[in-house]
Amino acid sequence: MAKQKFDRSKPHCNVGTIGHVDHGKTTLTAAITRTLSTKGWADFRAYDQIDNAPEEKARGLTIAISHIEYQTETRHYAHIDCPGHADYIKNMITGAAQMDGAILVVSAPDGPMPQTREHVLLIHQVEVPAVVVALNKCDMMDDEELLELVELEVRELLTKNSFPGDEIPIVRVSAIKALECGCGKRECEWCGRIWKLMDAVDSYIPIPPRPVDKPFLMKVEDVFSIKGRGTVATGRVERGIIKGGDEVDLVGLHHEPRKIVVTSLEMFHKILDSAEPGDAVGLLLRGVEREDIERGMVLAKPGSIKPHINAEAEVYVLSKDEGGRHTPFFNGYKPQFFFGTTDVTGEIHLPEGVEMVVPGDHVKMKISTIYPVAMEKGMRFAIREGGKTVGAGAISQVLS
């Protein structure tokens, strides 16, 4: 069957659901698709279709990231359902990096919980610019004063993490009630609130300025081979434009950059003439074997980015209260550096006169990684240890 072409008539925006486990992120995602499907703007995706990565079934946890496509009257959205559980925060970091805005789901009966706080901190670290709040399970709360208290608590949490807590839209919903009803009418008590939420997303989450004119860059998230056609690399275009026939550099990890050709592009299983920043695409590549490319490498305009092992960085070390280390670290500390899609072990070199770094400090440091990673000034990374984020940084200067 011939593939349809991807429709670009509406501006595109990447959003995602975040929040504490069992507060209703996946149910809300299902309710959004159900409501929008009544206008033909989405394919309804049931809870278990969204919760569909293989390892999740056993534990009932959303581990992988589900990509859902839908439209409103004015926009086209790619929606990711982020994992809610702290064990899978690594995926959250790769996923949150793909969001122009977040829908923070908070259960009204429970209020903000530890993972709510962790996710809000994380989206601030990875610079997700805007948040809309879905106060879920409001069918279980009939006390107006209690609801107002929960809203206040959510606003305080957002303000504490440098978001404009007083301005952020908070929409009271019941994902389960909207899903059960499914009429999709604006005047319906519960379906209408899903429309109200999407109106808030449409108006409050800005369409990001796309860095179209910069040199092409895409971090490789996944790789697979298609029999008889070649190797496909998937990821999100960070900047620049890529077209079929373009030559790119494959950069990072184990060998010198090598030139390969992009033969064709797909998004949501539809053929694309060209891909722009923000597009989550699969690139069919010529001149590279499946085993020569892996998650953590980047595809870039030839000559535009180089692999490095040494850099200077500005780093904020999370305090104990923010979920960071409880004790200081010293020169020669060897954590993992998380660059976009991969963890790389490395070493920290503190400036002269700095004996140690205490949780809560902001410090300039040199970092070195055990193998080359595509790095450039301004690139953000996380510092991780034992499965948790202990610092957030940005490259201030590439050294070698």
From Swiss-Prot:
Residues 19-26 are annotated as: G1. It catalyses: GTP + H2O = GDP + phosphate + H(+). Residues 174-176 are annotated as: G5. GO terms for cellular component: cytosol. Mg(2+) binds at T26. Pfam families: GTP_EFTU, GTP_EFTU_D2, GTP_EFTU_D3. InterPro entries: EF-Tu_GTP-bd, EF-Tu_GTPase, EFTu-like_2, EFTU_2, P-loop_NTPase, Small_GTP-bd, T_Tr_GTP-bd_dom, Transl_B-barrel_sf. Residues 136-139 are annotated as: G4. Residues 81-84 are annotated as: G3. GTP binds at residues 19-26, 81-85, 136-139. GO terms for molecular function: GTP binding; GTPase activity; translation elongation factor activity. Residues 10-210 form the tr-type G domain. Its EC number is 3.6.5.3. Keywords: Cytoplasm, Elongation factor, GTP-binding, Hydrolase, Magnesium, Metal-binding, Nucleotide-binding, Protein biosynthesis. Belongs to the TRAFAC class translation factor GTPase superfamily. Classic translation factor GTPase family. EF-Tu/EF-1A subfamily. Monomer. This is Elongation factor Tu.
